[in-house]
Amino acid sequence: MSERVKAVLVECLVPGYTPRMEEVKSVMETIGYDVVDCLSQKRDDYDPAVCIGKGKVDEIKRVAQEKGATVVAFANTLTGGQVLRIQKKISGKVLDRNLVILELFEKRAMTRESKLQIGLARLLYTYGWGRESVRMKGIEKEQVGPGGPGGYPFQVYEKDVRKRVSKLRAELRRIRRHKEMLRARREKLGFPVVALSGYTQSGKTTFFNRVVLEEKQIGLGPFTTLSTSAKLLRLPGKDAILVDSIGFVEDMHPLILDAFNTTLTEISSADLVLLFVDVSEDEASVFRKSLASKKIIRRVAPSTDLIVCANKIDLVKGNLLEKRLMGIRETFEGSIVLP
């Protein structure tokens, strides 16, 4: 992004919701947005029409105009109808948490595989938005161009999306077949596969670089690794293949997670998974992210051996560290936890 686009960040807080404001703000700043203001509202439940209160939408519009913001991003997940209604009210671009994450994915994508996966994820995630747009535009009898999610009759839109999704999936299948051939070759050579996994920025790529003397990018914010890398690891008595993979994120939308299936396959085919947990974060974050990581690993690799690596322990002192480690051991009962 050559020029920093000004954005207002919004969050609707309802009972049981985990605040995401700081996470989304960090991602947006990593992409290149200038977050000029953050607004939040506590409610008993989401407004089905615009997520947040209608009066709050008017405030968002006023703040955006006063501060020159052309983008309004929600830390929440929005429906297609909510996005379109808010967009119409504020006359600006509206993003939700998942679209912000996808924008970061697009910025970080370096390989053909990751670019295809991101394109597929965006199509699948915004498909319902497009249908809603076509429906709403039809009701309003407005002319819509193909630049928006709609643009033509619903059946044509649906057919076009299905065709594009089919093409992307076919290309990803070809990449997956190629990876499967490489895995079969590794198995034939007798190399066990060790997969690194964990929440984004947990330190797994730093570990990968130091162990295999690689120079993958690190320290650029969330989701530096969007594709997998595999390197031969020389060990006393037995060599192995060390694989780095995409970082996990809490509550990633299932459609986005499914689009990265070829990447997660590297974990499912491993002989051993090393799960990195950043224990330097606050206790609640460590607990939530541990559960999120465990859920994903057990979904894609339910029977694979797992070792949990408590990372960044030098940043936590004394009894606090022991308390964090105790919580991790309880979460991953039955698995080895290091140290």
Give the positions of each predicted feature:
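Flexible beta-alpha connector loops of hexameric P-loop NTPases
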Residues: 13-15, 47-49, 108, 215, ...
